[in-house]
Amino acid sequence: MDAKKAVRVAVVEQVGYREWTEELGSDREWIIQTLQSDIYAAAQKEAAGYGGFVLPIRYDIMLLISSNMGVQEHARVLDAIAGLSKVKVRMASYCGVKPLDAVERAWNALRRREERLIYERCEGEEYTAIAHIDLNNVTAITRAEGPVRTYYEVMDLMAKISKVAEKIGAITQYLGGDNILAVLPLNGSVKETVDMLLVRSDLKAGIGIAPTARASLALAAEALHEIRSKINPGPLVVKAQ
């Protein structure tokens, strides 16, 4: 990838969230989980309209992969979240060749500054590279091991992939089932980067490279479909826009 390209990531923080949860009393977890789901759904739907994609990570703190989203589009996603949240919501959006660097810049800005929305202009061309990673034969594994043991296996896999991702500046998110997403650095070869993330021989990955997160995910899904349907042997297939 061209080193001049950079990925934009926004950090969304619900300020005072823990304190709010403690005010709900002991019979609160169902309330918290329901609200978290509603906020995530609203944020994801709003972001998708502008080519973005939300990673819930902690739910009280979420990431918005937002390459080529303008400040007003960020504001609309922030408003969608604030309309449901019970606490103050803030957002900071920064760029970086490595997505983890963009997150760290945004988080530091939220700690230093008081604005509701902080939007730093990107020096490079905004782009996104995303890998959609999954486990081979997960249906057969689930039939043999059951849903809980299969889930534990995928969580162990997620932890191993995330350790590698941290070292190279990528961001990972569990998507459910056997699916793991990785937002990739834009320096070097994406194939070589993803090859490091495939920590087992029974993994495959579709990789999408595009100006927006939503387009990148669509391309990654197409690439993964080619591997699953044996149109392309894989285990890595890259599609770019």
From Swiss-Prot:
Annotated InterPro entries: GTP_CycHdrlase_3 (IPR007839), Nucleotide_cyclase (IPR029787), Rev_trsase/Diguanyl_cyclase (IPR043128)
Record keywords, A-Z: GTP-binding, Hydrolase, Nucleotide-binding
Enzyme Commission number, as recorded: 3.5.4.29
Reaction it catalyzes: GTP + 3 H2O = 2-amino-5-formylamino-6-(5-phospho-D-ribosylamino)pyrimidin-4(3H)-one + 2 phosphate + 2 H(+)
GO molecular-function terms, A-Z: GTP binding; GTP cyclohydrolase IIa activity
Major enzyme class: hydrolase
Alphabetical GO biological process terms: biosynthetic process
Gene3D superfamilies reported for this sequence: 3.30.70.270, Nucleotide cyclase (3.30.70.1230)
Function: Catalyzes the formation of 2-amino-5-formylamino-6-ribofuranosylamino-4(3H)-pyrimidinone ribonucleotide monophosphate and inorganic phosphate from GTP. Also has an independent pyrophosphate phosphohydrolase activity.
Entry-linked HAMAP family: GTP_cyclohydro_3
Sequence similarity: Belongs to the archaeal-type GTP cyclohydrolase family.
Protein name: GTP cyclohydrolase III
Source organism (scientific name): Aeropyrum pernix (strain ATCC 700893 / DSM 11879 / JCM 9820 / NBRC 100138 / K1)
Primary gene name: gch3
